Curated annotation (Swiss-Prot):
The lineage of its organism: Bacteria, Pseudomonadati, Pseudomonadota, Gammaproteobacteria, Enterobacterales. Belongs to the class-II pyridoxal-phosphate-dependent aminotransferase family. BioF subfamily. Gene3D superfamilies: Aspartate Aminotransferase, domain 1, Type I PLP-dependent aspartate aminotransferase-like (Major domain). It comes from Escherichia coli O1:K1 / APEC. Pathway: Cofactor biosynthesis; biotin biosynthesis. Pyridoxal 5'-phosphate binds at residues 108-109, 179, 207, 233. Disulfide bonds: none annotated. GO terms for molecular function: 8-amino-7-oxononanoate synthase activity; pyridoxal phosphate binding. This is 8-amino-7-oxononanoate synthase.
Length: 384
């Protein structure tokens, strides 16, 4: 098979399965409204959970940072790209989340890949939740360490895997809030079992940080758990982009030496770090509390109104509210019908989710109003 035949065959297979992904150019894609093709939609596909992407204080911080530092960092943090803005943000994140150190990354995907690649050797073992994010599972599959996957949130299965002989170290990998189902990991039980087998715990809390817990400190804080490695991202609750790894002093020093994604990538712009500092200030403030309370009320309203629809509603109390449809083509048809009625909803299909679990992945944000939820429910009931 030549290259073009290989590519064509892969694309054809996706088309036949109604699994071909598309991008839609939007004029506005975050916040309450999405604008595409000169049409305005209620936006139920955004990760901007607290509605901070358009916060004037955060926008102003980025603008002022660009005036002060320019629009780029100018290099890797190991060369010339680590500014005082990066340093102060790392210190503020570490203090907020109760860790000795924080290291900034350009994305959550890069952070997860970097940590696993740097930490793991062939004699070690990775034990990951089966529904962990693609960045975690891909990093684990590319690692020289063997990967074992435990059934979703099944601590008993995890314990059995950890109990089997391993010549090296064991790293347990999970998420705080799972990106496709919106449910939470039983972190306290997972950490207890991990410690019983002398392992370390790595938690990706992309969808919890800023959104849940006291001052938005996330899933681990809420469950009174402190993993050895905590990954937080800034494209969700913070409304910006980027990520950080929270860890001990010695682990931070180790990653600075061996995490290639950190060493060989240009740092995020200092202006972005300034915007993230402003976002963190909002998240920790009374305004942040009010936004989280509003989001919780919107979630409650949605779940109460969707119970009698002929779809499977995932057991999620988070901003991620999936409606499991099952069939790929049915999910696509429903998403299109909702868009025709003014609600922008995304159909998620395999391989992103397991076969037979195609879904409408609805996300609610603090930028929404109660009437938006009521409109969504009205449209869903009309198409159920």
């Amino acid at each position: 098979m030549i290259w073009q035949e290989k590519i064509d065959a892969a694309l054809d297979a996706r088309r036949v399965a109604d699994a071909l992904r598309r991008r839609y150019p939007v004029a506005q894609g975050a916040g309450r409204w999405l604008v595409a093709d000169d049409c305005q939609y209620l936006n139920f596909s955004s990760n901007d959970y607290l509605g901070l992407s358009h916060h004037p204080q955060i926008i102003r911080a980025w603008q002022q940072g660009a005036d002060q530092f320019g629009v780029g960092s100018g290099g890797s943090g190991h060369v010339s790209g680590y500014s005082v803005a990066h340093q102060v943000l790392e210190e503020e994140l570490a203090e907020w989340l109760g860790y000795s150190r924080a290291l900034l990354f350009i994305s959550g995907f890069a952070a997860n890949q970097a940590v696993i690649a740097a930490m793991m050797a062939k004699e070690d073992r990775i034990v990951a939740d089966r529904l962990s994010h693609a960045s975690l599972l891909e990093a684990a599959s590319l690692s020289p360490s063997p990967l074992r996957r435990f059934a979703h949130n099944d601590v008993t299965h995890l314990a059995r895997l950890l109990a089997s002989p391993c010549p090296g170290q064991q790293l347990v990998v999970t998420e705080g809030v799972f990106s496709m189902d919106g449910d939470s990991a039983p972190l306290e039980e997972i950490q207890q079992v991990t410690q019983q087998h002398d392992g370390w715990l790595m938690v990706d809390d992309a969808h919890g940080t800023g959104v849940i817990g006291e001052q938005g400190r996330g899933s681990c804080w809420l469950q009174k758990v402190k993993p050895e490695l905590l990954v937080v991202t800034f494209g969700k609750g913070f409304g910006v982009s980027g990520a950080a790894v929270l860890c001990s002093n010695t682990v931070a020093d180790y990653l600075l030496q061996f995490a290639r994604h950190l060493i060989y990538s240009t740092s995020m712009p200092p202006a972005q770090a300034q915007a993230l500092r402003a976002s963190l200030a909002v998240i920790r403030s009374d305004e942040g509390d009010a936004r989280r309370e509003k989001l919780a009320a919107l979630i409650t309203r949605f779940r109460a109104g969707v119970q009698d629809l002929p779809f499977t509603l995932a057991g999620s109390c988070s901003a991620i509210q999936p409606l499991i449809v099952g069939d790929n083509s049915r999910a696509l048809q429903l998403a299109e019908k909702l868009r025709q009625q003014g609600c922008w909803v995304t159909a998620i299909r395999p391989p992103t989710v397991p076969a037979g679990t195609a879904r409408l992945r609805l996300t609610l944000t603090a930028a929404h109003e109660m009437q938006d939820i009521d409109r969504l429910l009205e449209v869903l009931h009309g198409n159920g």
